[in-house]
């Protein structure tokens, strides 16, 4: 079985919380843009996202008072390097996690962080995991700030400092489901967690031990999965997505997941245009 078959995502460009994937657009927008959608080839488009981001369609929508930006944000996957090996930006990552937080209603999507989070203002270092669990921590979902109880937490960190341009993406996942809770660090290159992450994991462990009897920290780093120079972002997102879909962390320490798998996973992450 392919590793991608273990998760619930698909190459459709529609946001995953939509049940009808025949069209990503709301019925109102479909009706208003029928003529454009029927002749999308003449616009040089082969997808709905291409149509509604086309300058002519955007101009028409503005005249009609149609909010296409909301359609893109809530009914499509995030924009990003879908069909190439472009490096993922923090926007690609955060916008993807925001959309997953719509599908997974008990998932807390934390904005990205650089590795100097202990001395620079980042949400990652300010989160109280007990408040996350109890629904007392603010998170951004569907274009608004909400509070809701969450039993999973995910964040993608960069190993560079905030003064740099970025080096390598890694993932943090906190699982507060089941009997034994876990605080997990995943690095596709197989490197151990650095000091700031170790301290963060231990601090969160002590927070959670106040409300739950068994909490462990895990460094999922015994295999060097990544061989390329480009796929650390997809690997980090894939780890979070697989864990949300109840794929055990043990899967990542028992067999290598290839860069080719991540090339395919990009088509699950991002919309077409």
From Swiss-Prot:
Binding positions for substrate per the UniProt entry: 226
The cellular location(s) given in this protein's UniProt record come to: Host cytoplasm; Virion
Q: Which Pfam families match?
A: Peptidase_C48
InterPro entries named among the record's database cross-references = Papain-like_cys_pep_sf, Peptidase_C48_C, VPRT
Q: What does this protein do?
A: Cysteine protease that plays several role during infection including processing of the structural polyprotein or inhibition of the host immune response. Catalyzes the maturation of the pp220 and pp62 polyprotein precursors into core-shell proteins. Plays a role in the disruption of host pyroptosis via specific cleavage of gasdermin D/GSDMD. In addition, strongly decreases the host cGAS-STING signaling by targeting IKBKE via its enzymatic activity. Also impairs host FOXJ1-mediated antiviral effect via degradation of FOXJ1.
Question: Which GO terms of the molecular function aspect are on file?
Answer: cysteine-type endopeptidase activity
Q: Which residues form a coiled coil?
A: none
- Official protein name in the record: SUMO-1 cysteine protease S273R
What EC number(s) does this enzyme carry? Answer: 3.4.22.-
Per UniProt, which keywords does this protein have? Answer: Host cytoplasm, Host-virus interaction, Hydrolase, Inhibition of host innate immune response by virus, Late protein, Protease, Thiol protease, Viral immunoevasion, Virion
Q: Which family does it belong to?
A: Belongs to the peptidase C63 family.
Q: Which GO terms describe its cellular component?
A: host cell cytoplasm; virion component
Active-site residues annotated for this sequence: 168, 187, 232
EC main group: hydrolase
Does the entry feature the keyword Plastid, yes or no?
no
